[in-house]
A protein has these predicted regions:
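Acidic/histidine-rich catalytic cores of soluble enzymes
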Residues: 126-166
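Glycine/Thr-rich phosphate-binding loops of Rossmann-like dinucleotide-binding domains
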Residues: 44, 96, 141
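Catalytic-core regions built around general acid/base machinery
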Residues: 46-53, 116-124, 152
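N-terminal pre-domain/capping segments
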Residues: 1-85, 161
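Charged helix-capping and loop-helix junction motifs
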Residues: 21, 72, 106-117, 144-151
Length: 166
């Protein structure tokens, strides 16, 4: 495996800020790619300088579903960092009812979430970017109908990408 094939998911370092020493550590480990998170709120110019000074690039970023509502802002930010893939890492948290766990959604809710995600695909595609979803184990736990949440969601648009997490 080529070292350029490996990326560090920056989310895994979120408790170890500030970023300059983290990026230096990542560089020293021989990793040259990052997957960012929080693109919608980070200081892009500052982060770009940190990445450039460590010879690190980023092709993808995780953003909260709510951030998609300002697609224009995400596109501008992504392009400044040469990011090609916008990834939503989870369904939005629900505040209108109690859940057994954060993502205790029924089949209809998974289908709706898939449709909601899919409604943004063309906005990013028109700008040369892809929109995808990052899975967890719960998307592979069968719903009462026998369908998997990941199927309910991904069946809504064949252009929605899937960032698989094993």
């Amino acid at each position: 495996m080529n070292k350029q094939d490996i990326s560090v998911q920056l989310y895994t370092t979120r408790k170890f800020q500030p970023y300059p020493p983290i990026l230096n550590f990542i560089k020293e480990a021989g990793v040259v790619n990052l997957e960012l998170f929080g693109l919608e709120s980070m200081n892009i110019d500052e982060f770009k300088n940190m990445m450039e000074s460590n010879n690190i690039t980023s092709l993808s970023t995780h953003v909260g579903f709510e951030a998609l509502q300002d697609a224009k802002n995400l596109v501008e930010r992504a392009k400044k960092l040469n990011i090609k893939h916008i990834i939503v890492p989870a369904p939005p948290a629900r505040k209108d009812r109690e859940f057994k766990n954060t993502f205790d959604m029924n089949e209809e809710e998974w289908i709706t979430f898939g449709k909601d995600l899919s409604s943004y695909v063309s906005q990013f595609e028109d700008e040369g970017l892809t929109l995808g979803y990052h899975n967890h184990s719960y998307e592979f736990s069968a719903l009462p109908s026998g369908k998997l949440p990941i199927e309910c969601m991904m069946d809504q648009n064949e252009k929605l990408k899937f960032e698989i997490d094993l």
